[in-house]
């Protein structure tokens, strides 16, 4: 009875814990864990295989080798349990205690723990304020350190070499004390008075001026405070007692042939014990100092190797020259404890096999081979057989199953019915890589997979394998069915579009069915119903593509769900009428009355899901698939060599191009064009020739001319198999057809440059040897790229998951009024992403009004679904402020309103949804489709960079954004501001186009003027940068002396002379200090002011500026005073694809970033120094000036006296995300990262919802730096979680104290993962040693808030279905913290309670 109680108590104790704390172990604590001291290095007696006494495997210390049996065999069996044998001293108990009982080694001399010594920054070094080098010299017995200076002139912690030590001894005798080795460090650490030191440092912090010193002191202060608050003592960083790992965790296994396989740890422990024993003996013998010293040093080294081999000096190697695996290596890396055993476990009840197609399956089914099913469902079968009375015992049931009796198969059928199994295909890149299906038993040995789920798994049937897992418990089955069933995962979580769209054969079949052919058999017939059409087709009276008139019946569902039927006669084809049979009621016939390509089918399924819901869509998808397969078979579409029709024009086009190339070659040889120009031109010629050939080929392939019934020629789309496959989207693309029947075109070298001789042949004609050789470059590079790409993409996904893993939806609404402003994305003349796609499924943050009125169209907190988006489009709303996770105010999670719609389900997101992991998977999964290369701009691409005008594509009216302009004498506008944009607005006020226009642009139209499509409305010179005057007057040259600060040059062709300003470096000593400029003066010679300011109109001229005017010339507003030639911008490599995405998420600073204005104010230039200019910004309100040194070679966008706004670009270049955050705020940095990431994915045609990227950005922004501490506990300059500061500030405000102020900080995803509050999560990610060292010193405790920590400790995760469990536990915990009144109870009541408890325990078993 007593034992049972004990057992129950134990059970509950291990289960409930709310956190894990890590700290330093004191020597006494280590001794208290230990079950005895290990004194001998022996392991086991290799003849008897019995462990040696007091050795590393001693049974007396660690427990018995056999269950319930002592070593000498005196006590055996369960009845003696708990007895300690008096002969061999072994406790009689289970063997598994050898996995948990620890021993210890009493070290003869203290030893420093290498983690606290060597992991940077060295904790011991910080604590003692000594350099690591010095401490190492003390520890490894190279020099002395003063411990107690006494009355001498020495200082504590001073280093003494052997000689200086002897000198000091002679001088002071034993007044002072100096030692070497870990004892010395131990004494120094023991002497530190933490409280006093902390007070002293806090006092001196404000008065420290030097930045580096302040940083150092802050670091040291933080470490001291960590020790102080955690209750760790600094001297515990030095070990006096070494714990010994339980023997079963470092096993020694006898192999056959008398050899042993052993864990490396045993070797390392043996070295430590050997050296320790030798040192003890030497100390007893009072050996000479030098010998003892050497032995101590060796002991220190062996303990170092045991804790972290290879951290200091060379790693100790075993017999086979491989470094031994130390304790630190056991936990870190991919093979370490965290990633191998805690985060990745193996699963029982699983099997794997090759997959094949199951075209007859329903969407929720999979074919499971009988053999596999029998094995996987064994326990269920045994249970059923026994329950039926077909077998008396489990053993008999086993025999039956082994013999495969007939009844077994019947039982298997029953067991399997409606018991879902999970199928998984590696690599599992997103959550759709594991889905649940109902198994259908099949013969054969391959798993059958439904073709429509292949896209989600990224599976094909060329030998892929899949794994099957069986959910055992009822809850697991329930979750598999409700959440993971393939029929419940129709939409992709990445973009909310159907993921089960048909592909390949199915698309081809449906496309073929829905095509029309002129003069088809049965053309022009009238049918009264679809049934009649079917009959006509079956009897052969009408063929599939015949154009006919049919009366169809459509079901219309109105808003209230009322169904009504209506009939109409439509012009359609036989095939489309047949398709309408499988169309679910409630969808319009128009959806199938068209050529059904892949896009159309996808849209059809999407419409079906939104209008009719899940069930109808699933049934419809299956029907589509069966129909598609059927008609694809009937169509007999196949690829023959005659299908690749080579256009007749090809040869003339190629000949023309060759002639042009020859001409250019001649021009080059006569010196009219440079080599670079020739190369670019040649490539352009070939590129356009290739385009022409492919255009001719596509026209040839895609249409054929027929004579219809009326005898008129009519063009119709051709039934060429290759064309049909490409046009329907089943397989292949125009580019691939071009290589088959056009010309292969230009090829690239491995370094990315284009070879100027193209391949004019195509695959139909065949390639010659040279052409084939040129082609191999690209193919080979493609394969090499793919291999690299997979690894890189996987690593990106891992980092993303790690940074976002703990983000879960935890409440309905945080009530914030903030949000992101969403506008349609417009680049040049194209709308890249319309507003509806950006706001669909989001929640409105600020009321949206009808344009131009105060009436609310969409109130705050509206979830914008398809219907709302249509409304917004009708009223041509141009921008909406929507809620976003970035601005969400929830602590430790996000709220449903800020996230909006769950993309995979189509309704607002549920509590407990792990949005962080979903976001990481959605971004990481398409990673393998991105390219790896950096693009070098060359050839055709360089033409686009020298744009010089804006030509509009749509008619509308002109609108300027943040532009300053002046009107010149011709009445045209001249732009005099940077980063201005010009937009075209249609009559409804919607923005259609948007262009960046540079400084000095001349606009042909005034603002608000109407423009026609095709107008050129803005011009500028792309090669020079003008300086435009804003006032009219006459010009005066200042400091412009011929031959000193400028030279005159005369143009050979025109004969005009111009003035060129010399660069400072080219001037003589006289001109160094001069600053050439142009002043504008009125008729009376007085300075003119810039309009609206008190600043005189003076324009400084930088080096190499060209002035075309003479002194005293008259000038009008908007004229150019001077031009600064732009060096053709260095061809910057554009980082594209995966590396670009990684750079953005890691928030890496680009090389030569754009320089942004730190404050708003007026620009002026200070004294120049060697190679740099000094830029000064003076704020208008008379605040402090801001100075920055900028290298001379940077092209500046600003002139002296110009006004800039904070965050405006001063020098062009790629913008750094950190600068944007600092100067323009969170919203701008969020928009910047989202748009940049989306650009990369959009280029590859991958759709990802912005939400997912925002989720990652939220995690990158979760830290902040304290700028002023107020009355809080924080230190200035400390990096803290934003949520912690917010919570602390709320409390401070309630108490009427001063809250802390902070600045948000942007961290890259790796940094952000390592900086999480949870040390378990950080340690399992990267840099395990560093993270654990830091956590231990600070005595951190992990509240197990994220998903990863809970997986590691083996609990349900606080997301999904585990969210409820955690919520109830937290509520209970909050209750428990309130004081409880304890009731006293009598003995009989206690007995009664116990009886109830036992009954309960019995019923639960």
Swiss-Prot record:
List of residues binding Zn(2+) 1: 70, 72, 85, 88
Transmembrane segments: none
Binding site for Zn(2+) 2: 814, 888, 895, 898
Known EC number: 2.7.7.6
Family annotation (SMART domains): RPOLA_N
Co-factor note (free text): Binds 1 Mg(2+) ion per subunit. Binds 2 Zn(2+) ions per subunit.
InterPro entries: DNA-dir_RpoC_beta_prime, DNA-dir_RpoC_beta_prime_bact, RNA_pol_asu, RNA_pol_N, RNA_pol_Rpb1_1, RNA_pol_Rpb1_3, RNA_pol_Rpb1_3_sf, RNA_pol_Rpb1_4
Entry's Gene Ontology BP terms: DNA-templated transcription
Co-factor(s): Mg(2+); Zn(2+)
SUPFAM superfamilies, per the entry: beta and beta-prime subunits of DNA dependent RNA-polymerase (SSF64484)
UniProt-annotated binding residues for Mg(2+): 460, 462, 464
Record note on quaternary structure: The RNAP catalytic core consists of 2 alpha, 1 beta, 1 beta' and 1 omega subunit. When a sigma factor is associated with the core the holoenzyme is formed, which can initiate transcription.
Family membership: Belongs to the RNA polymerase beta' chain family.
NCBIfam families: rpoC_TIGR
Biological role stated in the UniProt entry: DNA-dependent RNA polymerase catalyzes the transcription of DNA into RNA using the four ribonucleoside triphosphates as substrates.
Name recorded for this polypeptide: DNA-directed RNA polymerase subunit beta'
Species: Shewanella oneidensis (strain ATCC 700550 / JCM 31522 / CIP 106686 / LMG 19005 / NCIMB 14063 / MR-1)
Encoding gene, per UniProt annotation: rpoC
């Amino acid at each position: 009875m007593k034992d049972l109680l004990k057992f129950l108590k134990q059970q509950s104790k291990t289960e409930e814990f709310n956190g894990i704390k890590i700290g330093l172990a004191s020597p006494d604590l280590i001794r208290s864990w230990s079950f005895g001291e290990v004194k001998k290095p022996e392991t086991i007696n290799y003849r008897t295989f019995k462990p040696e006494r007091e050795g590393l495997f001693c049974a007396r210390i660690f427990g018995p080798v056999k269950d319930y049996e002592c070593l000498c065999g005196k006590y055996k069996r369960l009845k003696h349990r708990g007895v300690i044998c008096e002969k061999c001293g072994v406790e009689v108990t289970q063997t598994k205690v050898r996995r948990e009982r620890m021993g210890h080694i009493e070290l003869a001399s203290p030893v420093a723990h290498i983690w606290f010594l060597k992991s940077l920054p060295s904790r011991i070094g910080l604590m003692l304020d000594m350099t690591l080098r010095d401490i190492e010299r003390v520890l490894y017995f190279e020099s002395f350190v003063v411990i107690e200076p006494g009355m001498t002139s020495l200082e504590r912690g001073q280093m003494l070499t052997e000689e200086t030590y002897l000198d000091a001894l002679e001088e002071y005798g034993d007044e002072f004390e100096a030692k070497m080795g870990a004892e010395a460090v131990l004494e120094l650490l023991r002497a530190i008075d933490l409280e006093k030191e902390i007070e002293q440092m806090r006092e001196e912090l404000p008065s420290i001026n030097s930045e580096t010193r302040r940083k150092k002191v802050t670091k040291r202060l933080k470490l001291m405070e960590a020790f102080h608050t955690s209750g760790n003592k600094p001297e515990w960083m030095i070990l006096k007692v070494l714990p010994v790992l339980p023997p079963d965790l470092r096993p020694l296994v006898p192999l056959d042939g008398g050899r042993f396989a052993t864990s490396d740890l045993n070797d390392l422990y043996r070295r430590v014990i050997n050296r320790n024993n030798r040192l003890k003996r030497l100390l007893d013998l009072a050996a000479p100092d030098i010998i003892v010293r050497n032995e101590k040093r060796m002991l220190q080294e062996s303990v170092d190797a045991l804790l972290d081999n290879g951290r200091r000096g060379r790693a100790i190697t075993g017999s086979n020259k491989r470094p031994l695996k130390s304790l630190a290596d056991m936990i870190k890396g991919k093979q370490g404890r965290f990633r191998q055993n805690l985060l990745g476990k193996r699963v029982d009840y699983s099997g794997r096999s090759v997959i094949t197609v199951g075209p007859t399956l329903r969407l929720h089914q999979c074919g499971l081979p009988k053999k596999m099913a029998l094995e996987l469902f064994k326990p269920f079968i045994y249970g059923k057989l026994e329950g039926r009375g077909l077998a008396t015992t489990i053993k008999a049931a086993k025999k039956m199953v082994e013999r495969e009796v007939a009844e077994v198969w019947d039982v298997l059928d029953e067991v399997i019915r409606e018991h879902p199994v999970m199928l998984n295909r590696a690599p599992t890149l997103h959550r759709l890589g594991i889905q649940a299906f109902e198994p259908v038993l099949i013969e054969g040995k391959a798993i059958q997979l439904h073709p429509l789920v292949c896209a989600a798994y990224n599976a094909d049937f060329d030998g892929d394998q899949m794994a099957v897992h069986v959910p055992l418990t009822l809850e697991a089955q329930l979750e598999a069915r409700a959440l993971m069933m393939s029929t419940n995962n129709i939409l992709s979580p990445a973009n909310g579009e159907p993921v089960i769209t048909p592909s390949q054969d199915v698309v081809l079949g449906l496309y073929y069915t829905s095509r029309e052919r002129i003069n088809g058999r049965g053309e022009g017939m009238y049918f009264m119903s679809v049934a009649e059409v079917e009959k006509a087709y079956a009897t052969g009276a009408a063929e599939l593509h015949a154009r006919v008139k049919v009366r169809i019946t459509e079901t219309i569902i109105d808003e209230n769900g009322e169904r009504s039927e209506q009939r109409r006669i439509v012009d359609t084809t036989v095939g489309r009428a047949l398709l309408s049979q499988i169309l679910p009621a409630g969808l319009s016939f128009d959806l199938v009355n068209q050529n059904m390509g892949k896009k159309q089918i996808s849209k059809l399924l999407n419409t079906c899901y939104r209008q009719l819901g899940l069930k109808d869509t699933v049934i419809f998808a299956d029907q589509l698939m069966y129909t598609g397969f059927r008609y694809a078979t009937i169509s007999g579409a196949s690829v023959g060599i005659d299908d690749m029709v080579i256009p007749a024009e090809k040869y003339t086009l190629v000949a023309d191009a060759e002639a042009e190339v020859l001409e250019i070659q001649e021009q080059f040889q006569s010196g009219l064009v440079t080599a670079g120009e020739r190369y670019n031109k040649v490539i352009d010629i070939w590129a356009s020739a290739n385009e022409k050939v492919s255009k001719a080929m596509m026209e040839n392939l895609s249409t054929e001319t027929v004579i219809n019934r009326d005898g008129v020629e009519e063009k119709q789309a051709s039934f060429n198999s290759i064309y049909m496959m490409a046009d329907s989207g089943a397989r292949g693309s125009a580019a691939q057809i071009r290589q088959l029947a056009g010309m292969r075109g230009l090829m690239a070298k491995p370094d990315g440059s284009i070879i100027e001789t193209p391949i004019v042949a195509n695959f139909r004609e065949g390639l010659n040897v040279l052409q084939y050789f040129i082609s191999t470059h690209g193919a080979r590079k493609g394969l090499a790229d793919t291999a690299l790409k997979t690894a890189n993409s996987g690593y990106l996904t891992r980092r993303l998951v790690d940074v976002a893993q703990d983000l879960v939806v935890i409440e309905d609404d945080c009530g914030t009024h903030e949000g992101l402003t969403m506008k349609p994305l417009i680049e040049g003349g194209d709308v890249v992403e319309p507003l509806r796609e950006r706001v669909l499924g989001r929640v409105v943050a600020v009321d949206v009004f009808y344009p131009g009125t105060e009436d609310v169209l969409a109130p705050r907190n509206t979830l914008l679904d398809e219907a709302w988006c249509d409304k917004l489009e009708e009223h041509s709303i141009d921008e909406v402020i929507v809620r976003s996770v970035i601005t969400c105010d929830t602590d430790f999670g996000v709220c449903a309103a800020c996230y909006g719609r769950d993309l995979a389900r189509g309704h607002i997101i549920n509590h407990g949804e792990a949005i962080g992991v979903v976001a990481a998977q959605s971004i990481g999964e398409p990673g393998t489709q991105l390219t790896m290369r950096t693009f070098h701009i060359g050839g055709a691409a360089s033409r686009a960079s020298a744009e010089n005008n804006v030509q509009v594509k749509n008619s509308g009216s002109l609108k300027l954004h943040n532009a300053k302009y002046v009107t010149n004498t011709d009445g045209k506008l001249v732009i005099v501001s940077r980063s201005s944009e010009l937009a075209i607005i249609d009559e409804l006020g919607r923005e259609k186009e948007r262009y960046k226009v540079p400084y000095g642009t001349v606009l042909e139209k005034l603002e608000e003027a109407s423009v026609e499509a095709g107008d050129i409305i803005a011009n500028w010179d792309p090669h020079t940068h003008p300086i435009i005057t804003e006032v009219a007057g006459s010009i005066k040259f200042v400091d412009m002396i011929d031959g000193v600060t400028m030279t005159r040059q005369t143009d050979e062709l025109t004969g005009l002379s111009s003035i060129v300003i010399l660069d400072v470096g080219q001037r003589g000593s006289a001109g160094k200090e001069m600053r050439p400029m142009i002043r504008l003066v009125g008729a009376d010679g007085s300075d003119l002011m810039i309009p609206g300011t008190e600043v005189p109109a003076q324009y400084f001229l930088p080096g190499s500026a060209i002035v075309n005017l003479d002194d005293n010339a008259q000038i009008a507003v908007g004229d150019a005073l001077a031009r600064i030639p732009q060096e053709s911008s260095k061809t910057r490599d554009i980082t594209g694809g995966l590396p670009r995405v990684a750079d953005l998420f890691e928030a890496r600073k680009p090389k030569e970033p754009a320089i942004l204005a730190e404050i708003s104010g007026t620009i002026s230039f200070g004294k120049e120094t060697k190679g740099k200019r000094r830029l000064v910004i003076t704020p208008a309100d008379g605040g402090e000036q801001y100075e920055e040194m900028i290298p001379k070679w940077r092209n500046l966008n600003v002139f002296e006296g110009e006004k800039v706004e904070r965050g405006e670009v001063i020098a062009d270049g790629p913008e750094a995300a950190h600068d944007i955050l600092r100067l323009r705020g969170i919203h701008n940095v969020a928009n910047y990262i989202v748009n940049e990431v989306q650009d990369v994915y959009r280029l590859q045609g991958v759709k990802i919802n912005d939400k997912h990227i925002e989720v990652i950005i939220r995690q990158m922004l979760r830290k902040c730096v304290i700028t002023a501490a107020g009355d809080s506990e924080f230190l200035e300059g400390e990096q803290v979680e934003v949520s912690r500061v917010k919570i602390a500030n709320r409390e401070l405000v309630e108490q009427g104290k001063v809250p802390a102020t902070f600045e948000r900080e942007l961290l890259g995803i790796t940094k952000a993962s390592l900086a999480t509050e949870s040390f378990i999560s950080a340690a399992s990610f990267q840099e395990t040693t560093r993270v654990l060292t830091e956590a231990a010193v600070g005595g951190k405790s992990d509240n197990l808030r994220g998903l990863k920590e809970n997986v590691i400790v083996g609990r349900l995760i606080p997301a999904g279905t585990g969210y409820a469990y955690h919520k109830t536990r937290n509520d209970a915990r909050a209750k428990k913290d309130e004081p409880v009144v304890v009731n006293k109870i009598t003995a009989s009541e206690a007995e009664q309670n116990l009886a109830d408890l036992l009954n309960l325990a019995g019923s639960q078993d």
